[in-house]
Amino acid sequence: MVLESTMICFDNSDFQRNGDYFPTRLIVQRDGINLVCLTKLRSNPENNVGLMTLSNTVEVLATLTSDAGRIFSKMHLVQPKGEINLLTGIRIAHLVLKHRQGKNHKMRIVVFVGSPINHEEGDLVKQAKRLKKEKVNVDIVSFGDHGNNNEILTAFINALNGKDGTGSHLVSVPRGSVLSDALLSSPIIQGEDGMGGAGLGGNVFEFGVDPNEDPELALALRVSMEEQRQRQESEQRRANPDGAPPTGGDAGGGGGVSGSGPGNEESAGAENEANTEEAMLQRALALSTETPEDNLPDFANMTEEEQIAFAMQMSMQDAPDDSVTQQAKRPKTDEANAPMDVDEDYSEVIGDPAFLQSVLENLPGVDPQSEAVRDAVGSLNKDKDKKSDGKDSQKK
C-alpha cells in the first residue's frame, strides 16, 4: 500500500451550473470527489486528503486530513461562481503538499476540469516540468467538451510523465456518460495494478460501502433504506381503499388460480399474513388512543343538582371496599330510621325563625322588615312555642 497525500481541486466556476451531466456538473463532480476521497483514504489508513476550489481567488477549503467527513461537509458548501484559474490552483496545491506532515508520503494532485482553460499550453507545460522535478503526480478529470481543453491537458500530462513515466493520468468523460462510473474504471481509482478500487463498486457491498471499514455509514444507509421502504408501503396503503383487492390478484378469475404455482401461493400467504398483522396493529393503536366519550355525561346541559348527583356517584364508585362492607354490616333498623331522622332535622331547620330570617335577608326583592314577613315569622314562633308546651305536658 502506497503512502500518499492528495490534494483535490474542485472546479466551481459558473460553467458547473450546466445540466448536460445530470443533474448538474457541480453535483456529478461532488460524486466524483467523494469516490476519489474514499479510495485514497481506504487504500491506506495513514493517507491524507485535502480540498480546494479553482474559481477566481483559489481557496483551500480543507488542509490535508484523514477525516472524510470534513472533506464532504466543506465540499457541499461550495457554490458555482466566476471562472476557473487552473494554473494558480495547481501551484497552491503543490505548496500545500510541500507542507505535509508525513514527509515519506508521495504527493498527488487530482484536478477536476469542467470549464474552458484560459492559459497557454506553454505555461502549463513549464509548470508540469517543475512538478516533475518535485516528484508530484497529477491526475486530471476533464469533462464538458470545451474546445482545446483535451489537447492542452494531454500536453501537460505528457510533460509530467516524460518518456517512460506513467504516474499521471488524464480521464476524459464525454457528455451522456456518468462521471463516477468513468472514474471507477480509470487508473485514478483502479491504480496501476488495477486493484485500487476494490470494494468500491455497488455490486460488491450493499450500498457500495464495506461495513467492516465504515459500520456507522453502512448502518445509516440501511436504516435510511428501511425508512424509505416503510414510507412507500404506507403511501400505497393510503392510495388503495380499504377492502380493495390488490392489483393482479383474484380479478383474473379461475384461470389465474389454476395457473398459479407454489411460489405464488407462498407469496399470497405472506401478503395475507402481513395484512392481518397490519390490521391487528392498527386496531390496537385505535383502541389505545380511543377515549371513552360515550360514558361521559354532557356537563353543559346538566343542572347543578344533576352535577352534584353525578359527583356523589363517582365518589361512591371511588370509595374503598371497607366502607362498602361496613355499610352492608349495618342493621336494617338504622336504614329504616335514617329517613325519619332526616325529616325531623329538616322540619326543625325550617321551623327555626333565625334561619328563616337569614334566608329572607339574602333573597332578592324581599324586605325582611315588612309587616307581612314579620307576621309570618311571628306565627312560626307561636307554633314552635305551642309544640314545646305540648311536649312538656306529655312528659309530665
From Swiss-Prot:
Q: Name one GO cellular component term.
A: nucleoplasm
Show the InterPro entries listed in the entry: PSMD4 (IPR027040), PSMD4_RAZUL-like (IPR049590), UIM_dom (IPR003903), VWF_A (IPR002035), vWFA_dom_sf (IPR036465)
Please verify whether the record's keywords include Nuclease.
no
Q: For bias kind Basic and acidic residues, which ranges apply?
A: 225-240, 381-396
Residues of the signal peptide: none
| Low complexity: compositionally biased ranges | 263-278
Q: Which residues form the UIM domain?
A: 212-231, 276-295, 303-322
Q: Which PROSITE patterns match?
A: UIM (PS50330)
Q: Name one GO molecular function term.
A: zinc ion binding
Example of a GO biological process term: proteasome-mediated ubiquitin-dependent protein catabolic process
Q: Give the UniProt keywords, A-Z.
A: Proteasome, Repeat
Q: Where do the record's region annotations for Disordered lie?
A: 225-278, 311-341, 360-396
Q: Where is the composition biased (Gly residues)?
A: 249-262
What Pfam families does its record include?
UIM, VWA_2
Q: Which residues form the VWFA domain?
A: 1-188
Give the protein's biological function: Binds and presumably selects ubiquitin-conjugates for destruction.
Oligomer status and interactors: The 26S proteasome is composed of a core protease, known as the 20S proteasome, capped at one or both ends by the 19S regulatory complex (RC). The RC is composed of at least 18 different subunits in two subcomplexes, the base and the lid, which form the portions proximal and distal to the 20S proteolytic core, respectively. Interacts with Ubc4.
Protein family membership: Belongs to the proteasome subunit S5A family.
What protein name does the entry list?
26S proteasome non-ATPase regulatory subunit 4
**Where does this protein come from, organism-wise?**
Drosophila melanogaster (Fruit fly)
